[in-house]
């Protein structure tokens, strides 16, 4: 029987089983140097070593998974000067590389734009970038709609 290609899903943290969440926590302790060994990390988060090894290569925080990818963002913005420019400057300030911009004509004082952004050199994780963009005055909505 041929080996199937893995499928990937983006899921909210609150629906994940405890063992998977603790695996992410243990990996984070190792990454940050708060634990020197796998034994130490799994003890700190109260996880068995077998569960850690079962999941460690299959679960990643979203910001690690999205690093080095091309992501597509959809924006809904109020039609006022400087909103898109502010968003572009924010992306540039975190070393995101904007590959494409597609902006539609405003309808009823609202404008849609779609941005493709290369994340390889970004010094900010994607979740935080989306939060910052969402706080820009005039941005009504920002969504991650795709990745390559």
UniProtKB/Swiss-Prot annotation:
SUPFAM superfamilies: ACT-like. It comes from the Bacteria. Signal peptide: none annotated. Transmembrane segments: none annotated. InterPro entries: ACT-like_dom_sf, ACT_dom, UPF0735_ACT_dom-cont. Residues 72-147 form the ACT domain. Belongs to the UPF0735 family. This is UPF0735 ACT domain-containing protein Dred_1164.
